[in-house]
């Protein structure tokens, strides 16, 4: 069977209810990632979990030591079928499909409607990588290789994050803003930041930014050089 052509997407779960069916090693990884993402409510079902203390203590987490029923899907935006039972996971995925709820099925990705990419994070920057389900192990390998690269780019990401709101406040043409930010990305600014060359960074910004932002240059660079 051909793998789906997945649509990449980042989700804000701060107002969402999610469900994880199964609290084994795989399920606990899903639980940890969901809590880290700030999910509003996370229901975990597992009738066989011997020690609930294995789950993290969190106000958003609700654990129920029982089997899955379709009624558990009420209000859920995202569901993970991560039990050790093929039958249970298939039932969860099928029930989600009937209700149009996104479901990640750990042991049979094609039964679900979404997969979880390998992710690398550095500050506010997140890189998500997938092989389309062909080789999650290789995706993880690539993620590890890219983590160092991401950390090298953090100073420039932070700087651009400081500049952008001030730039937008000038109410210039959208295309002008885009061209200016792209020019900064393609300039020597990243190299100058990595070298902690404050003078060169200041010169590059003064040459590229509108005069209305020049008084902010020192603040933009604060702590980065």
Which residues fall in each region the model found?
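Hydrophobic, well-ordered beta-alpha structural blocks that scaffold small-molecule cofactor pockets
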Residues: 1-55
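A generic structural signal for well-ordered alpha-helical segments
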Residues: 56, 61, 92-96
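Structural motif
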Residues: 17, 77-78
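Glycine-rich, highly charged phosphate/nucleotide-binding loops
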Residues: 57-74
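Residue-level detector of alpha-helix initiation sites
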Residues: 25-26, 87, 133
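An accessory alpha-helical subdomain
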Residues: 133-225
